[in-house]
């Protein structure tokens, strides 16, 4: 782990030895100048996919934190600063590191930065591993079906997360990736912003219900191939 401050910006990296121009790693313009942009994905903001295997051993995804909802139209990306560990990017980095080291299929965190701005606010960015040959599960389900064994895998993945007492507060069908591999399909969980450890058991069934509602919503909205039989297969994997 490498942690340092440069001017008004705090940096955290998942490596020990400093790298050239590392303070520039959270600027998309830096990667564009080096012709390292592999592509992008549009969500609340743009996530940039970067060619970084020579630097990190894996390609990377760079995201800037943006606010959503009505408040996001007034204040796009400023957050009230309390402590560095509670800043959005540092908190997500820390949780991802714990989950990755526990063997959960989540992107490896590569770096985080927090830029303090005026009046006690900050802006934040996160670098994570790019999951290769993967796509949003809902996009996949627009084109084809998963097998019963695949749904078991999804359920097992969520159970593994819950067994670590971690609640994914935005557990939905879009935050599951399906990766095509030579040995079959592998499933990943992404987007752990604002997620945290949680005590007790009741929240786990509520979390699963949230996911079920998400699938049902996309049956109507995106015409994905998903049935109650698929959901029961997911639950069987979760309970196995």
From Swiss-Prot:
Organism of origin is: Pasteurella multocida (strain Pm70)
Q: Which GO terms describe its molecular function?
A: ATP binding; kinase activity; phosphotransferase activity, alcohol group as acceptor
What are the TM regions of this chain, as residue ranges? none
Name the family: Belongs to the protein kinase superfamily. KdkA/RfaP family.
**What's one GO BP annotation on this UniProt entry?**
lipopolysaccharide core region biosynthetic process
Query: Pfam families this protein is in?
Result: Kdo (PF06293)
Q: Where in the cell is it found?
A: Cell inner membrane
Instruction: Please state the protein's primary subcellular location.
Output: membrane
Q: Quote the pathway field.
A: Bacterial outer membrane biogenesis; LPS core biosynthesis
Catalysed reaction, written as an equation: an alpha-Kdo-(2->6)-lipid IVA + ATP = a 4-O-phospho-alpha-Kdo-(2->6)-lipid IVA + ADP + H(+)
Q: Which cysteines are joined by disulfide bonds?
A: none
Matching SUPFAM superfamilies: Protein kinase-like (PK-like)
The record's InterPro entries line, in alphabetical order, gives:
KDO_kinase, Kinase-like_dom_sf
EC numbers listed for it are 2.7.1.166
One GO location term (cellular component): plasma membrane
Protein name from the UniProt record: 3-deoxy-D-manno-octulosonic acid kinase
Task: Give the signal peptide as a residue range, or say none if absent.
Answer: none
Question: What is the protein's membrane topology class?
Answer: Peripheral membrane protein
Function as written in the Swiss-Prot or TrEMBL entry: Catalyzes the ATP-dependent phosphorylation of the 3-deoxy-D-manno-octulosonic acid (Kdo) residue in Kdo-lipid IV(A) at the 4-OH position.
Key words, A-Z: ATP-binding, Cell inner membrane, Cell membrane, Kinase, Lipopolysaccharide biosynthesis, Membrane, Nucleotide-binding, Transferase
List of catalytic residues? 170
